[in-house]
């Protein structure tokens, strides 16, 4: 595959049955971008768009850079069976900035474990757990940036952990509901980011779909 599509690091099967396409916004991996991907059975190997989002030292408007010299590298294994599916993915990234006299890069990494378990022919449980340093723009609609600048203009990767759980139940042939919970925890260094940043987000949702 060559082109723009959902990130290989993302597991579409684990997204909840929701009126909102994402549904589990806080903890979900959600990115659509240019990439080159090779698939062999359940394995996927991808080189993806390496854009970096940065928090200025002590806070301020987000800086978006495309100064990376290497793409984001993703390796994923996905297994599907009659009982549901599981996916495990790892990602390695270069975070970089070259602007206003600043020229620095650092490494980022992330892991993801997600899946869907069929409780019955109509009911299922869906989950995702994602964690890493420099994961920011991939998770929770970029609630946290990938990195923050220190006083010397050097990048410091920000650690983020997100998770979500959803249960779908069918009441009748045309009626179904989902109970959804998701959360994200951001390990900000307040001495670098300032205090006007988000440390945690969470959400609950219940729906009835006809």
Model segments located where?
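Outer membrane beta-barrel
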Residues: 1-56, 67-85, 116-119, 124-131
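Aromatic/hydrophobic pocket-lining residues that form the small-molecule binding cavity
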Residues: 31, 201-202
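Membrane-embedded beta-strands of outer-membrane beta-barrel proteins
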Residues: 36, 75, 111-113, 165, ...
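Active-site-proximal beta-alpha loop/turn segments in soluble metabolic enzymes
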Residues: 51-62, 94-100
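Short, surface-exposed, charged loop/turn segments at secondary-structure junctions
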Residues: 58-63, 142-146
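Glycine- and other small-residue-rich loops at beta-strand/loop junctions that grip anionic moieties
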Residues: 62, 66, 156
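Detector for outer-membrane/organellar transmembrane beta-barrel domains
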Residues: 80-201
């Amino acid at each position: 595959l060559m082109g723009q599509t959902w990130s290989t690091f993302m597991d579409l099967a684990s997204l909840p049955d929701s009126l909102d396409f994402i549904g589990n916004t806080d903890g979900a991996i959600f990115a659509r971008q240019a990439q080159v991907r090779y698939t062999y059975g359940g394995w996927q190997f991808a080189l993806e768009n390496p854009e970096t989002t940065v928090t200025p030292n002590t806070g301020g408007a987000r800086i978006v850079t495309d100064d990376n010299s290497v793409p984001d590298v993703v390796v994923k294994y996905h297994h599907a069976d009659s009982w549901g599916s599981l996916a495990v993915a790892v990602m390695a990234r270069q975070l970089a900035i070259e602007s206003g006299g600043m020229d620095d890069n650092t490494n980022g990494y992330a892991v993801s474990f997600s899946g869907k378990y069929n409780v019955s022919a109509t009911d299922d449980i869906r989950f995702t757990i994602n964690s890493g340093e420099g994961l920011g723009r991939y998770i929770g609609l970029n609630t946290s940036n990938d990195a923050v600048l220190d006083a010397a203009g050097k990048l410091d990767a920000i650690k983020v952990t997100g998770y979500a759980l959803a249960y779908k139940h069918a009441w009748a042939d045309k009626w179904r509901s989902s109970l959804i919970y998701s959360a994200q925890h951001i390990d900000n260094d307040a001495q670098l980011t300032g205090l006007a940043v988000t440390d945690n987000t969470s959400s609950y949702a219940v729906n009835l779909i006809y």
